[in-house]
Design a protein with these regions (language model features):
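A conserved cap/lid and substrate-binding interface adjacent to the catalytic center
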Residues: 66-187, 205-212, 235
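A structural "domain/chain start" motif
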Residues: 222, 298-349, 440-444
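Bacterial N-terminal signal peptides
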Residues: 10-23
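Serine-dependent carboxylesterase/thioesterase catalytic core
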Residues: 170-252
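Short beta-strand->alpha-helix linker/helix-N-cap micro-motif
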Residues: 341-367
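C-terminal/domain-edge helix-coil "capping" segments
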Residues: 303-314, 387-390, 403-444
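Lipolytic serine-hydrolase domain surface
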Residues: 225-308
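Surface-exposed short loop/turn segments
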Residues: 359-410, 416-417
Length: 444
């Protein structure tokens, strides 16, 4: 796809950097906000390049999202962003731009490049010249040098022919200026969130209206001094989502003694998982919970959450999910059940969910399958048990069987994972997705 070729007057640009009770210390959020935070956390998770993050990206792609990933590298920074898009109803398109957090050595160097530089200018050349000034004081807008370097390299370093010999940042800003009804959302986790905030400030300096700039960050540190905060807090709409015990959100205030936060603050509390409170998987878990808690299961799926299911001849009859979980995990069973159901609904159509409320024999399931006109019967059993001598680390397992209309076994498989790098609900969805490749070989 040619870069941003689908952007038009009637489209929406959403620029932003995996369904689970909300532990929120802030005011209640609306269903629309929960949907946006959930989508932003998914895309922010997919912006990283590790195995689990790539799986999230693949899941989004199979659900109808397209990733256009860009990378500009020089000795200063490895500037990266992902433009994530999909088509909605009514010939509208939605765009997310995700900035990854720290995952490379050069990213860590960026984080610790804490010298303050002047932030200003109206062109990429002026941006660079202002940051090079050595004579400055607190009355000027000053920002974290490393974060500023990152955005300069990622968005404003390299003019390209496909952008009319302009940088990606200039091109995007012009699209927004020419289409003032379009909305721009920016997001990311940690370094990615800081990058999203500075990118919004740059777009503001390029003439983009404040109401077009919506920023959502997860565990992001402050990026600038008091002057910067007061100058730009009305030039964008910033929502900062943090975990209560996340140390990164305030680390720069301690290191520099002069950086301040601004914007709307939402605080989520991690009172279950004993891991570093800055992990993106925790932010994803809480945003998933918020989404499910504000969207009743019987309501239609919001447009951005809808998948593009594969059309099957006859469809799949899904038996009731079976769970055998340790007591610590049982409170999450409703969220697991809904997440697993919605994941299958996004993957296949038609999908018929069993009306049985309890375990039934295969013969009874096949009888109901035939009555429903389905071609396949899918059985999935899930277990979750604490690993011996490992506090709050669980072994999650899924056993899956796929049968035809006569009750003949087509395939069976077992997948497992621990919760070392995932929350229990995320692990269940991960196991189901891991089984998809083998399952699909037998579906027509």
């Amino acid at each position: 796809m040619k870069y941003l070729q689908a952007i038009g007057i009637g489209g929406y640009i959403l620029l932003v950097g995996l369904f689970l009770p909300l532990r929120c210390l802030a005011a209640s959020i609306t269903p629309q906000e929960a949907e946006l935070y959930f989508t932003s956390s998914l895309v922010s998770m997919a912006a990283y390049s590790e195995g689990l993050n790539i799986m999230t990206r693949e899941w989004l792609q199979e659900s109808g999202w397209y990733f256009d990933s860009r990378e500009n590298i020089n000795k200063v920074a490895d500037g990266r962003f992902h433009l994530v898009s999909r088509n909605l109803r009514g010939n509208q398109s939605v765009y997310f731009l995700a900035f990854p957090g720290t995952e490379r050595l050069k990213d860590a160097e960026i984080d610790f490049r804490v010298k303050r530089v002047v932030f200003g200018g109206k062109t990429p050349q002026e941006f660079k010249a202002m940051a090079a000034l050595t004579d400055h004081n607190g009355s000027q807008p000053l920002v974290h040098q490393g974060f500023n370097d990152y955005i300069q390299v990622a968005l404003f370093q390299q003019p390209l022919d496909e952008f009319g010999n302009r940088t990606a940042g200039e091109f995007l800003a012009q699209e927004l200026r020419e289409n003032p009804n379009e909305i721009l959302y920016l997001t990311g986790h940690s370094l990615g969130g800081a990058s999203a905030t500075l990118a919004a400030a740059r777009f503001a300096d390029l003439g983009v209206r404040p109401e077009q700039l919506q920023v959502i960050t997860f565990g992001a540190p402050a990026v600038g001094n008091e002057t910067f905060a007061r100058l730009y807090e009305h030039k964008m709409n910033l929502t900062r989502i943090t975990m209560a015990a996340d140390p990164v959100k305030s680390v720069l205030q301690s290191l520099t003694g002069g950086f301040v936060q601004f914007g709307k603050k939402i605080v989520w509390k991690n009172n279950k998982f004993e891991r570093f409170d800055h992990d993106m998987v925790l932010y994803l878990d809480q945003s998933l919970r918020a989404y499910q808690d504000t969207h009743p299961e019987q309501e239609p799926t919001p447009a951005m959450m809808q998948g593009t299911p594969v059309k099957l001849s006859g469809g799949i009859y899904v038996a009731p999910f079976e769970f055998k979980l340790d007591k610590k995990l049982q409170q999450d069973m409703p969220y697991m059940r809904r997440s697993l159901k919605e994941s299958l609904q996004q993957a296949y159509a038609p999908l018929i969910l069993s009306e049985f409320k309890e375990k039934k024999s295969l013969a009874a399931l096949c009888a109901e399958q035939k009555q429903a006109g389905a071609r396949y019967v899918l059985l999935e059993r899930f277990t979750g048990h604490q690993i011996r001598n490992e506090h709050n680390n669980f072994r999650m397992m899924m056993e899956e069987e796929l049968y035809d209309t006569d009750g003949n076994l087509l395939t069976m498989q077992t997948t497992s994972a621990t919760t070392q790098n995932l929350t229990p609900i995320e692990a269940m969805v991960y196991l189901q997705f891991q089984a998809k490749e083998q399952r699909d070989k037998f579906l027509q």
